[in-house]
Amino acid sequence: MRRQKGMTLVEVLVALSVFALAGIAVLQTTARQASSLSRLEEKTFAGWVAENQQVQLRLEQRWPEASWVRGETQFAGLRWHWRWQGVETGDPQTKALDVEVRRNKDAFAADASLRTYVVKQ
């Protein structure tokens, strides 16, 4: 009996199936990473918008109000919706300042949320 060299058709089909499945897995992983990177960029920008609102309030030397103050701004080519409010602390000279930022005005969860403390001068 003569020994055959090469692969049978079944072996070739199995090998192609394995490579196809591996390729699909790589594509799915790449797509997820791209989506995660986009979300990370959005959350970073939202954090910067929140920090900018805190700085703006300090520069204006405004005492934070107890009710939500709302507004919107352009940053990194995107429209951001922000809101902030002052929260009473145990010290009448100090308030907590909560800032929330969203890309979608009606979104329940904020893309970024920061708290800092403001001292009356």
From Swiss-Prot:
Pro-piece positions: 1-6
Modified residues (N-methylmethionine): M7
Principal subcellular localization: membrane
Bilayer disposition of the protein: Single-pass membrane protein
Gene3D superfamilies, alphabetized: GSPII I/J protein-like (3.30.1300.30)
Cellular component GO terms, alphabetical: plasma membrane; type II protein secretion system complex
Entry function: Component of the type II secretion system required for the energy-dependent secretion of extracellular factors such as proteases and toxins from the periplasm. Part of the pseudopilus tip complex that is critical for the recognition and binding of secretion substrates.
Oligomeric form and interacting partners: Type II secretion is composed of four main components: the outer membrane complex, the inner membrane complex, the cytoplasmic secretion ATPase and the periplasm-spanning pseudopilus. Interacts with core component OutG.
Protein name (record): Type II secretion system protein I
